[in-house]
């Protein structure tokens, strides 16, 4: 039941995602139907026509065709005989020569090799009409012929006389040459073959003189054995050959299309399905969603079953519709008129199932969706190519070869279609009664069996590859996967084995003895390899994690925290060592472990189209919750996470913070016993982060929690034990108090300075009181000083002095605390890696407090000024105008080159190897088919066709012999045939039989005979069924053998073999054989390969768009023209490479139609003009896609359909037999707007025109009108002509399409369609205003500072714009979705030079929207904004020259290094080339990124990526720098480094606007800030101004030791209430209390003394007291008015779990709204500033 429940959930998930991916789902279901529509269109435009009976006249075989009498030759035709040593053969040949009125020359050859060598090498061999080779060893020259005679007739390889007009279809109806490799045409038809030829037509047995020569040789043999008798007999005997009559029939030209094009179209229709399936499966794999579900208990096989059922249902619908369309008569015709619809459905379903499993198999070999999709689709197409060869040699293939070829599902499908079309041609269709009928020792039933076998094999391969080679993610299974799995010996949980103590034992706290170690890690290593280099991410890690505890894992960026989490969750395998979870080893028992595992990854693993509720419901039930419990817990989790108002929002529309909340909820739901949380609160605002802390504190009771974070206060609050990693090694581990005790150096005093602060004077004051004080940090407005613990008795005097001289010293506020976790972390990092000591280097004295640890301010100023210190000491001027455009163009071009260089495997495979491989395989198959298969000997006996029925009429008492009938019967029986003597007309009998039993008639009745006596003369008619290629000669052989037996006895026999001559030297060199249809094969195959090539140009553009790198480049100053034209230039250069290689391939294969000296320029021109047209089209369409993988798949499908379909339609309808040439011309003109059609038709016409020229030349038609023979096709001497078979109009169309699509691209980039829509909305202004007013009736801000700022801007706008770098006036932003959203509401502010302006607010408050408007990523709905005097709305190009932007999410290109990216943006900014290196090096030095500067960005940690994003914003000369949460994901050391850099940039005269969730960051950096709530400013001013206005109280935080928590907590509360009357308990986190104390009558020194004593009396682990912080003010604004302490506690009681653990506490409810009334100011502040203790 549990398995069925999980399966049901997975199916629900799949169908929800498919339903919400409307376009993909429609594409998956409709693309096969679109190809079906093409088939239906062809069916309806090739209607069957009724034809009456046809009788053909007899042909006299005693005469050569007229052709030989009129052929203009300089020399005589020659009759060659072999071996020449036999005089007997010479005499026989001379008798043959004398038979005809044509003057022949008799020529003998000693042996067959000499004859063939002469044919191949000597030009005179053209005159040899036939070689007669007798299979008999002559001992002497006069030795007679035996009675059993066998000889070969070797006519020329190419017919001389029979000129069949060439076909312009993808498949020829007939095979060229003598067709000796085939018994029947590959394309059977109900209509008579070669309808207009009485002698049978192709392969030309009569026209080429084969029958006449054969009969003459047979008569000569008879005369040799019975000279007189033979002479007498043939005086009164006349031998004729006559074609079978053909009864009334339906001539259906569609059958040719069905037999040949339908397999190709069916394959192309299902390739779309294969691409979508592969992409869907790989997308989940690439995003780690599959492995994430596995961690929730979903076995891998269950995952596959769910996917199979999902796609099975969707393809079932498609196949059902296809079956209905194919089998339902429309306008009295159907695609399959006679076949059983049930069998058609079963056949298509078997193929669909095989396609599904093929996609599954291909997905296991790849990790990236777009790579796997491209290669998977290519391989799927390749598996069809063998059929193109097999179909033309089907009867030559052995049964084993056929079986093996059908292991490719496409070959099996095409073979099945072949069976269906054959039965349709016979008029019976495929039925249950004939599925076992054998055609070439194979049957339709076997095809169905092979499709099912293919499905099983593909499934098996997928299972083995995934199990044994999980590649990047997952744990590989053992090779004995099918064997009985040995039961692992699980050691006792508490005694798995104590890990050895590391060398840093003094910093490892003793393990708790009374708790269960749920997770044990023993000597764990993880090494990553990249080429020859390796990186050790985890080095000898040993530690235990305990139930009921939160273990916090800290470390700098890249220390190995995420790697540890990935190993424990089974996402990656350890290189060495062991890890046990609940006693199960991760490398062996991951399935068991995952049943109790909850994981919140560092990067959200969410389904884009799942809602918040869907995620919680899905994962809750996967973990075992019942639907009712899951519903309740989902509602509870929504409330706890503050996501109630987003319950129905899809995850792709959530902000980053909301996604983190959802990921945490997924990990927590259903009570997972082991929680691994990788930076769970990254990106969350302060209220949300605190709510998550509450939630984790409540939920940890019976769980084991491993948490990583960069927030030290989070680690301090949540961590029962804290472990710190550095470079993969464990440095220390223990409780927060233990680590503070080990690493603490005393008390830390944090001083927030004013701009007027005199640092030297302040240092002297501190040094005067505390001589041993040490400077830890001096960044921005923040200064941190260490006060040794032994000098605590001097603190009171120091604090009194600082309070009294606060204004004089320039102190905004100061605070003191005992050692914090941040300081512990920094000290640990310094000890482990001295390179991190750049900013935190200890000072041995504060006097004179130099800042030598920082880069001087003047060095950073050079980045943002007009001069730059170089050796020449010349001022640096930024490039402008044309020079800037050239530099930017060069930067964009280098970016494209770098992408191609770094992704060379992808570029090489998709853009070069793939199209070339397709064309090479096609050429290999086609060349082998056309030039090799036909040159085989064929023995002309009835046994070749199996057992047949031979009707015959012989008159009673025939003049030839009264026993003639009996002799004929004996001869047939001896040959294994069935004689059937009839009375009357043989022709009438054959017509009757064909009408009575059309099924199988052509295979049962191949030849017949009629012996008619008229007076004393006998007429012998050898009747042949022309549906069989070689029946004319067979019928003649049958009659001649009977006559030979009459003359020489029953033992006499003649066996004739048709063995074409080898190709002559001229034929080989000039490829005389017409190969026009081969060109269409190549075109269709090549169009598919070129679709992948074309779609590959979207990968980078969509990738840049998805990470918003393109937007950042535009913001940095790149114009639309520069961005796209540089990309187009490089992509055209890239397009030239496969084009030139393609020409080389044609030269290698000697494909003259494309490799001729006149054709090569045309091929290159066609290809390059196609690239010119299609690349801008791909760029334009790429705007519709969000991920490179989906873009690649959809574009391949689109380009394949829009290129192959038009070419097929136009080519098929152009066939003269269909009678739709006018329609073909119309379609051709319509499809000129499609580059793929132009490419296909141009190449097709180029090939076809060349082949027709060869055809006319080969047939020696220079003296007659070749165009008449070609049935209307006009050979163009000038291939560039516009007329039929010219390529001129296609080249012109491609040349015009390029600018058209480029214009569309620029219009799309400029949001022209959005602007047009907005302009059109102006026709209904009253409606819009009324609608806006109804929805956005928002109150004006109440804060007087906000109102004053807005009023000032209104009054003095022009003056402010001139004097200030940034002015924002009443800016609003409305997102016009289904429900319009007001994101920013009339915001006004001014930012001056050397000012850092902070935007604070909850997630979704509108901060990023302001940035998007300032950078013009989003248009301003109303209002104005000015940068350096330029209006953003009208002068965006000029504005962008002055803006530097660090977006919220890293807009970085993974294929570039950090240095390369900075260089690129330096060029975009216009920094002269000679200064770029120094500029970039300086930024890297300041950001401490020199070590990783030359590594690829994809290897960077999150913190390093943020650092690089900030560096990009600083490049060049931006007057205004916008930093959107720049320090997200950074460790404390990196964060302080960033602060230092930003502060120095501000000091250099720049204007900075910053958003952040770190209040500490805002206090350190911001000179002014505003708090936003629901798009409005609620307050505005400097941090100190806001504290003075709203923070007139003190904040006391105290942390009681957990050991004494219950005992001392209440006593301490009573102490605070008694000591500080009026205090208010604002928050409580188990052992952490936060009080707000009234401000009046409190002194810093007095409070410090009281709390020092309380620390001892009440077992306090840590405490602090400070003026109400900026974070407290922020929380006050963002907290709902109704959220009082009592109400919060009441909500906690309701939401608490039914049986909470003993150490759990009530949890505070997170804010449920994003707005609150402005807090009222408290009474005036006391004269002294409080201190953080």
UniProtKB/Swiss-Prot annotation:
Extent of Pro residues compositional bias: 1718-1733
Q: How does it sit in the membrane?
A: Multi-pass membrane protein
Q: Does the keyword Cytoplasm apply?
A: yes
Is Membrane one of the keywords? yes
Please give the catalytic activity noted in the UniProt record. cholesterol(in) + ATP + H2O = cholesterol(out) + ADP + phosphate + H(+)
Free-text description of this protein's post-translational modifications in UniProt: N-glycosylated.
Binding of ATP, residues: 555-562, 1401-1408
Q: Where is the ABC transporter domain?
A: 519-752, 1366-1599
- Which Pfam families does this UniProt record tie to the protein? ABC2_membrane_3, ABC_tran, R1_ABCA1
Swiss-Prot/TrEMBL GO biological process terms: lipid transport; neutral lipid metabolic process
* InterPro entries per UniProt: AAA+_ATPase (IPR003593), ABC2_TM (IPR013525), ABC_transporter-like_ATP-bd (IPR003439), ABC_transporter-like_CS (IPR017871), ABCA (IPR026082), P-loop_NTPase (IPR027417), R2_ABCA1-4-like (IPR056264)
- Renumbered residue ranges of the record's region Disordered: 1681-1733
Tissue specificity note: In the testis, detected predominantly in elongated spermatids at the late stage of germ cell development and in sperm, with no expression detected in immature germ cells such as spermatogonia and spermatocytes or in somatic cells such as Sertoli cells (at protein level). Expressed in the head and tail midpiece of elongated spermatids and sperm (at protein level). Expressed exclusively in the testis.
* Listed GO MF terms: ABC-type transporter activity; ATP binding; ATP hydrolysis activity
Residue ranges annotated as compositionally biased, kind Polar residues, are 1681-1692
Protein purpose? Promotes cholesterol efflux from sperm which renders sperm capable of fertilization. Has also been shown to decrease levels of intracellular esterified neutral lipids including cholesteryl esters, fatty acid esters and triacylglycerols.
The name on file for this protein is ATP-binding cassette sub-family A member 17
Q: Which organism is it from?
A: Mus musculus (Mouse)
């Amino acid at each position: 039941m549990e398995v069925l429940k999980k399966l049901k959930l997975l199916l629900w998930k799949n169908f929800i995602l498919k339903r919400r991916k409307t376009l993909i789902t429609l594409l998956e279901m409709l693309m096969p139907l679109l190809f079906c529509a093409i088939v239906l269109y062809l069916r309806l435009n090739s209607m069957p026509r009724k034809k009456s009976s046809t009788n053909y006249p007899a042909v006299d075989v005693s005469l050569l065709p007229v052709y030989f009498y009129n052929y203009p030759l300089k020399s005589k035709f020659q009759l060659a005989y072999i071996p020449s040593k036999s005089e007997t053969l010479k005499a026989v040949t001379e008798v043959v020569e004398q038979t005809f009125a044509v003057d022949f020359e008799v020529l003998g050859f000693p042996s067959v090799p000499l004859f063939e060598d002469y044919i191949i090498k000597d030009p005179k061999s053209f005159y040899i009409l036939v070689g007669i080779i007798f299979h008999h060893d002559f001992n002497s020259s006069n030795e007679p012929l035996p009675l059993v005679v066998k000889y070969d007739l070797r006519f020329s390889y190419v017919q001389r006389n029979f000129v069949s007009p060439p076909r312009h279809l993808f498949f020829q109806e007939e095979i060229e040459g003598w067709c000796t490799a085939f018994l029947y045409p590959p394309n059977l038809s109900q209509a008579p073959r070669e309808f207009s030829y009485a002698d049978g037509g192709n392969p030309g047995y009569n026209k080429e003189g084969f029958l006449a020569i054969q009969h003459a040789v047979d008569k000569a043999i008879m005369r040799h054995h019975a000279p007189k008798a033979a002479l007498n007999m043939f005086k009164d005997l006349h031998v004729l050959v006559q074609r079978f009559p053909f009864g009334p029939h339906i001539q259906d030209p569609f059958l040719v299309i069905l037999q040949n094009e339908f397999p190709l179209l069916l394959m192309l229709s299902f390739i779309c399905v294969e691409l979508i399936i592969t992409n869907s499966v790989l997308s989940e794999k690439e995003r780690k969603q599959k492995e994430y579900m596995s961690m929730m208990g979903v076995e891998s096989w269950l995952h596959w079953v769910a996917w199979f059922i999902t796609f099975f249902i969707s393809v079932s619908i498609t196949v059902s519709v296809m079956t209905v369309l194919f089998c339902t008569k429309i306008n009295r015709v159907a695609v399959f008129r006679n076949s059983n619809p049930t069998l058609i459905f079963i056949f298509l379903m078997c193929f669909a199932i095989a396609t599904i499993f093929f996609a599954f198999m291909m997905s296991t070999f790849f990790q990236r969706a777009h790579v796997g999709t491209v290669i998977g689709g290519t391989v799927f197409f390749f598996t069809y190519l063998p059929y193109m060869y097999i179909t033309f040699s089907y009867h030559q293939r052995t049964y084993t070869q056929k079986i093996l070829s059908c292991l490719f599902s496409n070959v099996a499908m095409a073979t099945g279609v072949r069976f269906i079309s054959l039965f349709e041609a016979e008029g019976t269709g495929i039925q249950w009664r004939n599925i076992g009928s054998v055609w070439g020792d194979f049957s339709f039933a076997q095809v169905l069996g092979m499709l099912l076998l293919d499905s099983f094999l593909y499934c098996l391969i997928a299972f083995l590859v995934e199990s044994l080679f999980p590649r990047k993610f997952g744990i590989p299974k053992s090779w004995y996967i099918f064997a009985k799995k040995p039961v692992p010996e699980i050691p006792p949980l508490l005694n798995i084995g104590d890990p050895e103590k590391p060398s840093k034992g003094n910093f490892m706290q003793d393990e708790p003895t009374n708790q269960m170690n749920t997770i044990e890690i023993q000597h764990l290593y993880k090494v990553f390899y990249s080429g020859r280099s390796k990186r050790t991410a985890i080095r000898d890690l040993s530690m235990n994690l305990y139930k009921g505890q939160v273990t916090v894992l800290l470390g700098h960026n890249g220390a190995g925290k995420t790697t540890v989490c990935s190993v424990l969750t089974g996402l990656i395998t350890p290189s060495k060592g062991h890890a046990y979870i609940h006693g199960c080893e991760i490398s062996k028992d991951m399935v068991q472990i995952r049943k109790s595992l909850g994981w919140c990854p560092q990067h959200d693993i969410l389904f884009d189209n799942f809602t918040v509720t869907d995620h919680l419901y899905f994962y809750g039930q996967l973990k075992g919750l019942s639907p009712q419990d899951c519903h309740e817990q989902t509602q509870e989790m929504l409330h706890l996470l503050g996501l109630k108002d987003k319950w129905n929002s899809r995850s792709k529309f959530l902000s980053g913070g909301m996604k983190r909340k959802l990921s945490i909820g997924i990990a927590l739901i259903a009570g997972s016993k082991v929680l691994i949380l990788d930076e769970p609160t990254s990106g969350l605002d302060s209220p949300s982060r605190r709510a998550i802390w509450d939630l984790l504190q409540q939920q940890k009771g019976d769980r084991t929690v491993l948490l990583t974070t960069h927030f030290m206060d989070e680690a301090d609050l949540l961590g029962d034990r804290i472990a710190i990693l550095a470079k993969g090694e464990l440095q220390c581990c223990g409780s927060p108090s233990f680590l503070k005790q080990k690493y603490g150096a005393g008390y830390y005093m944090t001083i927030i300075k004013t701009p007027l602060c005199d640092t030297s004077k302040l240092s002297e004051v501190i040094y005067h009181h505390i001589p041993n004080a040490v400077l830890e940090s001096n960044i921005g407005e923040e200064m941190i000083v260490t006060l040794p613990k032994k000098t605590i008795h001097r603190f009171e005097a120091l604090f009194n002095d600082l309070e009294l001289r606060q204004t004089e010293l320039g102190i905004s506020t100061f605070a003191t605390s005992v050692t914090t976790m941040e300081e512990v972390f920094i000290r640990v990092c310094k000890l482990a890696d001295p390179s991190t000591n750049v900013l935190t280097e200890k000072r041995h004295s504060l006097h004179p407090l130099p800042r030598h640890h920082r880069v001087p301010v003047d060095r950073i100023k050079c980045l943002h000024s007009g001069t730059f210190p170089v050796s020449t000491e010349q001022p640096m001027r930024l490039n402008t105008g044309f020079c800037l455009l050239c530099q930017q163009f060069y930067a964009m071009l280098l970016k494209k080159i770098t992408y191609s260089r770094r992704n060379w495997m992808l570029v090489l495979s998709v853009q070069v190897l793939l199209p070339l491989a397709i064309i090479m395989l096609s050429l290999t198959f086609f060349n082998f088919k056309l030039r090799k298969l036909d040159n085989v000997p064929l023995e002309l006996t009835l046994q070749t066709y199996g057992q047949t029925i031979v009707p015959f009429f012989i008159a009673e008492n025939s003049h030839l012999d009264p026993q003639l009938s009996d002799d004929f019967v004996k001869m047939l029986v001896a040959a294994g045939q069935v004689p059937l003597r009839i009375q009357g007309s043989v022709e009438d009998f054959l017509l009757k039989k064909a009408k009575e039993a059309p099924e199988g008639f052509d295979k049962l009745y191949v030849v017949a005979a009629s012996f008619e006596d008229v007076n004393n003369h006998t007429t012998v008619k050898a009747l042949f069924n022309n549906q069989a290629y070689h029946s004319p000669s067979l019928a003649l052989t049958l009659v001649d053998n009977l006559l030979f037996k009459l003359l020489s006895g029953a033992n006499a026999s003649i066996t004739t073999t048709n063995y074409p001559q080898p190709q002559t030297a001229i034929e080989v060199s000039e490829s005389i054989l017409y190969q026009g249809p081969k060109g269409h094969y190549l075109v269709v195959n090549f169009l598919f390969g070129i679709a992948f090539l074309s779609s590959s140009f979207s990968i980078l553009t969509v990738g840049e768009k998805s990470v918003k790198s393109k937007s950042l480049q535009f913001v940095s100053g790149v114009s639309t023209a520069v961005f796209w034209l540089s990309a187009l230039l490089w992509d055209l250069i890239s397009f030239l490479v496969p084009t030139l290689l393609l020409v080389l391939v044609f030269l290698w294969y000697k494909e003259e139609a494309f490799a001729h000296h006149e054709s090569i320029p045309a091929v290159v021109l066609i290809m390059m003009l196609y690239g010119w047209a299609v690349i801008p089209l791909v760029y334009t369409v790429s705007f519709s896609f969000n991920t490179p993988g989906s873009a690649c798949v959809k574009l391949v499908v689109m380009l394949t359909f829009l290129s192959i379909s038009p070419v097929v339609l136009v080519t098929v309808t152009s066939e003269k037999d269909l009678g739709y040439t006018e329609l073909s011309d119309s379609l051709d003109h319509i499809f000129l707007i499609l580059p793929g059609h132009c490419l296909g038709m141009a190449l097709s016409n180029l090939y076809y025109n060349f082949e027709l020229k060869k055809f006319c030349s080969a047939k020696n038609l220079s003296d007659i009108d070749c165009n008449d023979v070609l049935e209307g096709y006009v050979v163009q001497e000038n291939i560039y002509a516009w007329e039929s078979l010219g390529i001129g109009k296609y080249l012109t169309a491609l040349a015009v399409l390029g600018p058209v699509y480029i214009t569309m691209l620029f219009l799309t980039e400029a949001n022209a369609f959005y602007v047009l829509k907005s302009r059109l909305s102006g026709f209904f202004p009253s409606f819009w205003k009324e609608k806006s007013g109804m929805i956005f009736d928002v109150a004006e801000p109440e804060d007087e500072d906000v109102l004053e700022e807005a009023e000032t801007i209104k009054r003095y706008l022009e003056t402010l714009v001139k004097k200030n770098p940034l002015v924002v006036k009443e800016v609003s932003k409305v997102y016009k979705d289904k429900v319009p959203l007001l994101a920013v509401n009339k915001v006004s502010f001014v930012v001056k030079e050397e000012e850092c302006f902070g935007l604070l607010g909850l997630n979704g408050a509108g901060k990023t929207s302001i940035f998007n408007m300032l950078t013009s990523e989003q248009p301003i709905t109303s209002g104005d904004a000015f940068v350096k005097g330029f209006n953003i709305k009208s002068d965006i190009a000029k504005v962008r020259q002055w803006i530097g932007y660090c977006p919220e999410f890293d807009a970085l290109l993974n294929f570039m290094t950090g240095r390369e990216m900075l260089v690129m943006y330096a060029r975009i900014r216009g920094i002269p080339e000679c200064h770029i290196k120094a500029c970039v090096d300086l930024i890297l030095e300041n950001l401490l990124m020199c070590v990783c500067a030359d590594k690829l960005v994809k290897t960077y940690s999150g913190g390093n990526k943020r650092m690089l994003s900030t560096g990009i914003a600083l490049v060049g000369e931006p007057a205004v720098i916008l930093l959107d949460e720049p320090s997200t994901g950074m460790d404390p050391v990196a964060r302080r480094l960033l602060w230092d850099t930003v502060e120095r940039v501000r000091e250099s005269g720049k204007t900075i606007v910053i958003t952040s969730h770190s209040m500490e960051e805002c206090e350190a950096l911001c000179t002014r800030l505003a708090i936003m709530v629901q798009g409005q400013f609620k307050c505005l001013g400097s941090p100190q101004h806001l504290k003075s206005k709203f923070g007139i109280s003190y904040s006391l935080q105290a942390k009681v030791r957990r050991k004494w928590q219950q005992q001392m907590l209440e006593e301490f509360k009573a102490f605070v209430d008694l000591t500080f009357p009026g205090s208010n308990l604002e928050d409580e986190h188990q052992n952490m209390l936060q009080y707000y104390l009234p401000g009046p009558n409190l002194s810093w020194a007095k409070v410090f003394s009281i709390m020092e004593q309380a620390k001892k009396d009440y077992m306090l682990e840590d405490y602090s007291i400070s003026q109400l912080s900026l974070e407290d003010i922020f929380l006050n604004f963002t907290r709902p008015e109704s959220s009082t302490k009592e109400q919060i506690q009441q909500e906690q009681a309701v939401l608490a779990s039914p049986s909470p653990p003993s150490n759990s506490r009530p949890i505070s409810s997170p804010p449920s709204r994003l707005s609150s009334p402005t807090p009222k100011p408290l009474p005036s502040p006391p004269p002294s500033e409080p201190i953080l203790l």
